[in-house]
Amino acid sequence: MIIKNIKMENFRSHRNTSINFSKGITSIIGQNGSGKSSIFQAMNFALFAPRGNNFRIENLMQQGAASFSVELEFEMMGNTYLVKRKRFQHKTDDKLYVNGKLNAESASEINKKIEEILEIDNSVFSNAIYIKQGEIANLIQMTPRDRKEVIGKLLGIEKYEKASEKMNIVKKSYEETLLKLEGELTQEPEILENLEKLKNEVSESEILKEEILKKYENLEKLKLEKNSEILQMEEKFAENNQLKENLKDIISEIKNINLEIQNFKNSLNLVAEESKNISENEENYKKYLELELKIKELNNKLIGHKSNYESYNKLKTIEESLLKELGVLKESLKDNKKNPDELKENLKENDEKILILDKIKEKIKELEFIEKQIYEIKIHKKTVETLFDSVKIYDDSIKTFEELKTKKNSYENLLKEKFDLEKKLQNETDEKTKLISELTDFEKIEEKINLENELKEKYEDLSEKIDKLNEIVLKKESKISEYKNSKAELEKTKDSCHVCQSKITEEKKQELLEKYNSEIQNEQLSTESLKKQLEIILNKKEKMKVKLNEIDSFKLKYGELKEKKNYSLKVEESIIETTEKLNELTGKINEYSSLNDEISLIENKLKNLENDYKNCNYSSQFLTKNDESEFLTKKLELSKIIGDYDSSKIENEKKSLENLKDELKNTIYNLEREINLKKELKNIQNDISSKIGIVECYVKWETEKSDFENKLSECKENYEKYMESLAVLKNYSKTYSVEINNLNEFLNQKIAEKQQFCEKLLETRTEIEKNIQTVNYNPELHENAKRLYENILNEFNDILRTLERISSELKLKNENISYLNEKIQNLSNKKEEKKKIEEFKEYLDKIKREIFSKDGFQKYLREKYIPLIQRHTNQIFQEFELPYSHIQLKDDYSLIVDGLPVETLSGGEQIAVSLALRLGISKAVCNNIECIILDEPTAYLDEDRRKNLLNIFKNIKTINQMAIITHHQELEQIADNIVKVRKIGENSKVSLE
């Protein structure tokens, strides 16, 4: 796979980033946190869209964005692929293009296709193509055992260990099932015993059931006989009751028919009587109707002319009123000689005189107010002079009171501060108590933490010893191997030395063979001894590692407790400081002990002087507002205007003028009223003359109407009797649906019909009474038969219940037998199941032992991969142009370079070996690898090692494309392409150089 381009929108810190890649080395350079590693994370997401915390949408999407997208273009086997992944909060939009054509759209389909194209999954991609920070240096520095574990993870062997662990869980669940089955199978003897017991009980119940069935059949026969007798009696009882009911109905109907006959007779009498009344009152009835018509005609005429008549009467009333009022006015005006205009001029002159008097009256009031003000000024002057000393004392007391108030505020602030300090002290004391209880384990943990450096030194010493012993053991094993080879060669030789080809005797050959055997034995003994020492040291190291791990596990808690310890010291210091402040405040507060008494004293003094101060202040304000000289000048001016007038004189003159004014107004009104009334009287008299003819006719019609009404009253009684009788006859006519003239005939006919029907009913009654005697029903015999039947029925029901109970018990027992038979069958099935599980458990043990155990398939994979890793490692190592030819990865995962332990090489050479090994592992995992991504490969390396690594990178030819993520600027020197990443605000910006 060769990466061509990556595009990111709203992905982590990349708002809108596009990077083109080419073959060779691409250095992605930027400071920590600039967004370099996000570029690889985007590639990983584009290819496989993995799940997990690191790939959660909220963690990948920029804050405030509604979506993010990643596009990756790459080449593989001559084809161009473009993967597009877009994510919203609740929606996905993925596409895969092959050579520009849409190939897949769903996320799962794209993931599957990518795995098919690359021939690797996400796990292999993450381990083979992406080399994480520190992996290169760590491969050399770690022990063979740790190296074995790391390489196992990179190769994916650890999944077989996990599978082995999961198989233990499965195996355990089967073991639990076996225990459960064994427990259930213990019930079998008890179930068989219960089954036999139930079968015996069923046989006994069947015999009892047969006996009861015989009794049941005899009683049922007797019950049917007695039931037949009762049914016959019930029929007689029903027939007798029906006849009695019929007789009762006939008697009732005869009674009703007689009532109807009587009602028809009564109606016939009433019709005759009402017909007579109609004949007697018919003449006056007709006369009444004629009078009523005439009255109605006159009434219509009166209504038509009523308005004219009422208008005439109203005009006559007004005429009388006007004549009367004109007479009164003429009497009142007999002494007046002036016309209205002259009188109005006199009224105007009178009003002007009244106005002058009102103005003088206002001036008198103004003068009285000024004299009052002058008097009050004198009073207030005297008040100010009298209270001057009291006011001065009051002002001094106010100043003193303000000073005391300021002191009181200070005092209250001190009290508040004291309260706050006491509260703070209480809280700190509680906090201290809490911290003391939480810090009980602190000293023990601290003591263990303090031993860490010492343990680490010992651990490192042991590691060095182990490495040295391993080196010695390797050398000795190499020597043993050489001796064995020499011995084997010597054994093959007949008469010449295998080394120098010189002649050798059999004795010399035996001597040399013994020497080789002796050397081999000595070296083997020495090696065994060293291995025992090594095992002891490894055990010590492992125990020490356990202790160090324990210390590591304590570190987090220790950190928390350390913080709490420091915090507790601060709390203690704060308690001391707060206590000192509290003591100091208490001293200051005591200085204010007499303050309240002083304030009370001054408050009483101010209270006593307050009225004097207010009075004096009011008088001073009054004198400021009112100038005495101005009031005196005004008094003089007003006195000149008023002259010898006083209020009494003005009132008398004004009263005379008002009386004259009223007289003039009254005379003017009467003169004008007389003229208007005369005009109105003339108009009314003309209207009266026009209406006099109509009024005479109206009076005549009223007289005629009154005469007719009197005559109508005389005929009214006969009219009402006629109408009442007619209403009765109409009611009968409506009731019987017959004309009034045919009522007599109809009622006589009805009476005859009803009498005839009544005679027939009497005959039926006689017949029913005879039938009742014929039935001959006896209630006593019927009751005795019912009691006997009831006793038989009760006995029958008792037997039936017993029979049902036995049947129910039999059914239940048979069901229990079926249930127990099923249970026995189930237990038989469980025996089979137990056998199968035991066989399958043995099969699982075999699979685990032969495939998933460390000595099974895992061992096979390691043995398969070690030569493959070694071959790829050496191919890459050859490109580095170093003075070494061969790297050996031994079975125990120790590294040998040209026969020397890797630890004996220089730092730069070790890095070269480590890089070759890491790339070799990648190629072993993914044979067709063309691209490698290295994340901070120079991390944790000193300057010399970094320089060596740069030179090595230049020499790599096996891998077509390398992307190096780094913050070291030196990597620009070896790069074919440079991508610089920097953080501006919250966004990453990329530039190509």
Curated annotation (Swiss-Prot):
UniProt binding sites for Zn(2+): C497, C500
Keyword terms: ATP-binding, Coiled coil, DNA damage, DNA repair, Hydrolase, Metal-binding, Nucleotide-binding, Zinc
Coiled-coil boundaries: 192-222, 402-493, 570-612, 646-677, 702-731
Residues annotated for ATP binding in this entry: R12, N32, G33, S34, G35, K36, S37, S38, Q133
GO terms classed as biological process: double-strand break repair
Domain of life: Archaea
SUPFAM superfamilies, A to Z: P-loop containing nucleoside triphosphate hydrolases (SSF52540), Rad50 coiled-coil Zn hook (SSF75712)
Co-factor binding comment: Binds 1 zinc ion per homodimer.
Positions of the Zinc-hook domain: 452-556
Keyword field contains ATP-binding: yes
InterPro entries: P-loop_NTPase, Rad50/SbcC_AAA, Rad50_ATPase_archaeal, Zn_hook_RAD50
Alphabetized GO MF terms: ATP binding; ATP hydrolysis activity; zinc ion binding
Gene3D superfamilies membership: Helix hairpin bin (1.10.287.510), P-loop containing nucleotide triphosphate hydrolases (3.40.50.300)
Cofactor dependency: Zn(2+)
One Pfam family of this chain: AAA_23
Record note on domains: The two conserved Cys that bind zinc constitute the zinc-hook, which separates the large intramolecular coiled coil regions. The 2 Cys residues coordinate one molecule of zinc with the help of the 2 Cys residues of the zinc-hook of another Rad50 molecule, thereby forming a V-shaped homodimer.
HAMAP family membership: RAD50 (MF_00449)
Family the entry assigns: Belongs to the SMC family. RAD50 subfamily.
Role: Part of the Rad50/Mre11 complex, which is involved in the early steps of DNA double-strand break (DSB) repair. The complex may facilitate opening of the processed DNA ends to aid in the recruitment of HerA and NurA. Rad50 controls the balance between DNA end bridging and DNA resection via ATP-dependent structural rearrangements of the Rad50/Mre11 complex.
Subunit structure: Homodimer. Forms a heterotetramer composed of two Mre11 subunits and two Rad50 subunits.
Protein name: DNA double-strand break repair Rad50 ATPase
Biological source species: Methanococcus maripaludis (strain DSM 14266 / JCM 13030 / NBRC 101832 / S2 / LL)
Name of the encoding gene: rad50
